[in-house]
């Protein structure tokens, strides 16, 4: 039976599972459960291990150095995107940027690549200093949406260098651009049918859009520019719409 408590789950290792009890002795997780979430004896808590097995538990003992939870049920987690989807997104101003990472994580992408673009409003030094923060935001979002796996947030890369060096690693590349007009996701996949196992890359611009130099690069690399419709969206909204559109078109079975 699959339970849905609309609550975060917490990551453990199989070594924490002893008979029918989960023993939480990790200091950070123990502190979070006891002092931040203030769990009580008898409260239900969800855990998941590195093998993507989810445990429905009931807290049975809380001590200074360990919390114990009795396993009520366990089952393989189904909360994982079936397609290999990566998003390379130009870095945005802070609130929108964090929102973009959260939404990409919730939508199941495997990899998030921060890009430095010509029209990026954030200095490169600031972006590189935030690399660890980007991964932490993604990790926290995983717990909130009950994903079975963690996305990888890479080190920031310059857009042109990334596309020149790494575009060959993807089977489908979609550059989302306001100038694409009538060529949308549906038309793209009609011309380029998805094959199971294809690695898909979605590239999203920043608030100022792509520069003329970057558009020229897309043409040189024969990359498809994709429209999200007639409306102009904020960059973080465009990311959400683009990823959801790909998932809907390709399917997530």
Where do the language-model regions lie?
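Mobile, glycine- and charge-enriched loop segments
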Residues: 45, 70, 76-87, 194
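RNA substrate-binding interface of SAM-dependent RNA methyltransferases
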Residues: 78-174
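A mid-sequence, solvent-exposed acidic-amphipathic segment
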Residues: 156-194, 200
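Short, acidic/turn-prone active-site loops that include or flank metal/cofactor-
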Residues: 180, 207-208, 230-233
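A C-terminal functional module that forms or caps the active site or interfaces directly
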Residues: 197-217
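Structured adenosyl-cofactor binding patch, chiefly the S-adenosyl-L-methionine
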Residues: 212-253
């Amino acid at each position: 039976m699959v339970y849905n408590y609309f609550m975060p789950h917490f990551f453990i290792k199989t070594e924490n599972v002893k008979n029918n009890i989960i023993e939480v002795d990790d200091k950070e997780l123990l502190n979070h459960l006891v002092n931040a979430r203030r769990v009580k004896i008898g409260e239900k808590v969800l855990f998941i291990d590195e093998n993507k097995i989810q445990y429905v538990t009931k807290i049975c003992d809380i001590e200074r150095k360990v919390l114990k939870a009795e396993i009520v049920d366990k089952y393989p987690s189904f909360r994982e995107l079936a397609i290999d989807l990566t998003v390379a997104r130009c870095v945005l101003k802070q609130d929108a940027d964090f929102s973009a990472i959260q939404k990409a994580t919730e939508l199941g992408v495997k990899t998030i690549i921060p890009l430095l673009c010509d029209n990026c409003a954030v200095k490169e030094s600031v972006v590189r200093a935030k690399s660890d923060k980007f991964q932490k935001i993604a990790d926290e979002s995983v717990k909130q949406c009950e994903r079975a796996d963690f996305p990888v947030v890479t080190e920031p890369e310059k857009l042109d260098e990334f596309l020149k060096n790494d575009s060959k690693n993807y089977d489908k590349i979609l550059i989302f651009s306001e100038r694409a007009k009538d060529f949308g996701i549906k038309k793209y996949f009609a011309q380029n049918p998805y094959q199971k196992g294809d690695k898909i890359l979605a590239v999203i611009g920043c608030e100022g859009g792509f520069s003329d130099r970057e558009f020229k690069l897309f043409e040189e690399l024969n990359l498809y520019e994709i429209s999200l419709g007639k409306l102009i969206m904020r960059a973080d909204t465009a990311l959400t719409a683009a990823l959801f559109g790909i998932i809907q078109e390709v399917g997530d079975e």
